[in-house]
């Protein structure tokens, strides 16, 4: 029987990423044959990964990578925040973003079939990571963003990589594009413009806003405060030319009733129309990048600020770790029991 030396164990660990005891056991079982030991560890890793397949992985990191005129943002999940800080996990996230930016897959299946520098597929890399790290590691999603030569990427990660953003800006420079990405990270827009909002979504959100006003008015009535008006519109998508024209006529009638001389109306009407637009685009302000107040200059919307510097936002992608994943809440006793059961089954 071959002698299993510390040097041999170290070599296997470096090649496979396995722990000391797992590497030693594999070498013993294969009589010191390095290639067979690697294959054995791989098979055991797949078995361990299969056992962990039904676990919920809602922690993790985003990865961002720019490759010329193509950029990728990815989300990779782990079960705990502790593992999300593991160097091997971070390396896997970064390698995933790079592979996707360079390979430009059309969907997750194509992404997982990409060949990594190690020669294994991305899917195998995740199986092996699950086995060696000891938690379910899963590739969740990616977005590819493209630009032209005269446009700029703004790549930004926030909160230790829990949020990843890529923005494309035309005009300005990379620093401006990054500032817009910082805004996207903080303010969570879901689309670029109101034209991308679903009409039913706008109606539903407007109903929610008016419900909030109704509750507020009940509180105001208790302290003899005047009621707030309900919102008739929530988005520019609902403001037809006729609606805007009628709003201007209503303002003129209001000014006439107040006895304001017509010669000063032209100075008053634009400000009141701005107020009308602000009051009737609350859904846009919550969900569309261009309509949000810019965090770098709160006197302007993102669109108005970019206009002022001869720039324009073209597109963006924003991922936040765990969005839409239902976390499983275990009490401490259940967690300990599950950990002990897993240890006995491995």
Swiss-Prot record:
InterPro entries: EF-Ts_dimer_sf, Transl_elong_EFTs/EF1B, Transl_elong_EFTs/EF1B_dimer, Transl_elong_Ts_CS, UBA-like_sf. GO terms for molecular function: translation elongation factor activity. Gene3D superfamilies: 1.10.286.20, DNA helicase RuvA subunit, C-terminal domain (1.10.8.10), Elongation factor Ts, dimerisation domain (3.30.479.20). Its main location: cytoplasm. CDD domains: UBA_EF-Ts. Keywords: Cytoplasm, Elongation factor, Protein biosynthesis. SUPFAM superfamilies: Elongation factor Ts (EF-Ts), dimerisation domain, UBA-like. One of its GO terms (cellular component) is cytoplasm. It is found in: Cytoplasm. Residues 80-83 are annotated as: Involved in Mg(2+) ion dislocation from EF-Tu. NCBIfam families: tsf. Belongs to the EF-Ts family. PANTHER family: ELONGATION FACTOR TS, ELONGATION FACTOR TS, MITOCHONDRIAL. Associates with the EF-Tu.GDP complex and induces the exchange of GDP to GTP. It remains bound to the aminoacyl-tRNA.EF-Tu.GTP complex up to the GTP hydrolysis stage on the ribosome. HAMAP family: EF_Ts. This is Elongation factor Ts. It comes from Streptococcus equi subsp. equi (strain 4047).
């Amino acid at each position: 029987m071959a002698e299993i030396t510390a040097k041999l164990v170290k070599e296997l660990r470096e090649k496979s990423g396995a722990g000391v005891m797992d590497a030693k056991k594999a070498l013993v079982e294969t009589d010191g044959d390095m290639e067979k030991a690697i294959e054995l560890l791989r098979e055991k890793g797949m078995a361990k990964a299969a056992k962990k397949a039904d676990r919920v992985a809602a922690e993790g990191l985003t990865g961002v990578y720019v490759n010329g005129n193509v950029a990728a943002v990815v989300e990779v999940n782990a079960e705990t925040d502790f593992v999300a800080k593991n160097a091997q996990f971070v390396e896997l996230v970064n390698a995933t973003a790079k592979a996707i930016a360079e390979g430009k897959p059309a969907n997750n299946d194509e992404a997982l079939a990409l060949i990594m520098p190690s020669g294994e597929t991305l899917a195998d890399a995740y199986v092996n990571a699950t086995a060696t790290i000891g938690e379910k590691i899963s590739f969740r999603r990616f977005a590819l963003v493209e630009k032209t030569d005269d446009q700029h990427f703004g790549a930004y990660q926030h909160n230790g990589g829990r949020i990843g953003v890529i923005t494309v800006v035309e005009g300005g420079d990379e620093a401006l594009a990054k500032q817009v990405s910082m805004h996207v990270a903080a303010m969570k827009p879901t689309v670029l413009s109101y034209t991308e909002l679903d009409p039913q979504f706008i109606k539903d959100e407007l109903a929610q806003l008016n419900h909030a006003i109704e509750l507020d008015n009940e509180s105001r009535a208790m302290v003899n405060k005047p009621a707030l008006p309900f919102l008739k519109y929530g988005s520019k998508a609902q403001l037809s030319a006729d609606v805007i024209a009628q709003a201007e006529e209503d303002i003129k009638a209001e000014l006439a009733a107040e006895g304001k001389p017509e010669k000063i109306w032209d100075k008053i009407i634009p400000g009141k129309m701005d107020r009308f637009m602000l009051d009737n685009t609350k859904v846009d302000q919550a969900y569309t990048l261009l309509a949000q107040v810019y965090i770098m200059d709160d006197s302007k919307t993102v669109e108005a600020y970019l206009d002022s510097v001869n720039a324009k936002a073209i597109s963006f992608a924003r991922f936040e770790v765990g969005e839409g994943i239902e976390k499983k809440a275990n009490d401490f006793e259940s967690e300990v029991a599950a950990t002990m059961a897993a240890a006995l089954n491995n």
